[in-house]
A protein has these predicted regions:
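SAM-dependent nucleic-acid methyltransferase catalytic core
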Residues: 2-29, 35-39, 82-193, 197-204
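Amphipathic, non-transmembrane alpha-helical secondary structure
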Residues: 31, 56, 180-184, 217, ...
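Conserved S-adenosyl-L-methionine
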Residues: 36-97
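Short active-site oxyanion
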Residues: 40-44, 61-62, 169-173, 224-230
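A short acidic (Asp/Glu
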Residues: 56-58, 75, 185-186, 203-206
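The conserved SAM/SAH-binding core of class I Rossmann-like methyltransferase domains
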Residues: 66, 177, 233
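Beta-hairpin (beta-strand-turn-beta-strand) motif
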Residues: 68-69, 126-128, 235
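Conserved acidic-Pro-Pro-aromatic motif
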Residues: 188-238
Length: 238
């Protein structure tokens, strides 16, 4: 749904609920952030996709969502191309709770995931980890977030969310790549939205340990010189 405010800006309606439980997601602010986007653009790019809140809010007619972390992109790609499988991934793990304690299931899935990173395990972990904080050890890259105190949402609730998000993401392609590749692919008239790792999170996030804001700002400057629209969310207090 799109309501034009004036000739330059538009407003959008965010999804009703998050698909992934993800700390730092922009679900609450997606409508406000998108007000600053131009109403007319070609392809929408989001190179730090994360929770996908902005992409889903815009539900673009042409979009590219990317992230450096492959298991995350596996989730988004499955959402678009095989949503029923995504539900089965979640159901298979959630329904183990009852025969085993929530913590036992979580620890088991976490152990499997750390041995072989994959989207199916990562989906469950994002929805059940403590506070939605997806934390990785710098020493070995293992996810180290403990089990959360909350109960995971019911399978049918998750299924309804998948249906809505699948519809919103139907025109989006998902790729696992570095943000610099996305900038190199964008053309004049395209829009890039960047929500990079904040300074206080760079010690715990996947792919964030070597991130340099100065490099991103150089990419943004070059993109703008080519007639590409760029929007940036940044931790101004740091």
């Amino acid at each position: 749904m799109q309501l034009t405010l004036d000739s330059k800006f538009a407003t959008y309606v965010p999804p009703k609920s998050q698909l992934l439980k993800w700390v730092g997601n922009k679900q609450k602010f997606a409508g406000q952030i998108s007000k600053y986007f131009p109403a007319n653009y070609n392809t929408f790019y989001e190179p730090f996709l994360g929770s996908g809140a902005i992409m889903a809010t815009l539900s673009p007619s042409s979009g590219v969502g990317s992230d450096i972390y492959k298991p995350l992109i596996e989730i988004w790609d499955t959402l678009k191309n095989d949503p029923n499988l995504l539900v089965e991934w979640y159901k298979e793990r959630v329904e183990r709770i009852g025969n085993e304690s929530k913590k036992e299931v979580y620890d088991s899935v976490l152990e499997t995931f750390n041995k072989n990173n994959n989207g199916a395990d990562f989906l469950f972990l994002t929805r059940t980890c403590y506070g939605g904080i997806v934390r990785f050890r710098k020493s070995d890259g293992y996810m180290s977030t403990p089990c959360g105190v909350h109960n995971p949402i019911p399978v049918e609730t998750f299924r309804k969310r998948v249906k809505e998000w699948n519809h919103r993401m139907k025109n989006v392609s998902f790729v696992a790549s570095d943000y610099k590749e996305i900038f190199s692919n964008a053309k004049e008239g395209d829009l890039i939205y960047c929500d990079p790792p904040y300074s206080h999170s760079q010690s715990i996030l996947y792919g964030a340990h070597d991130f340099k804001l100065t490099d991103l700002l150089e990419c943004i400057s070059e993109a703008k010189s080519k007639g590409i629209f760029v929007a940036l969310s940044i931790d101004g207090s740091k």
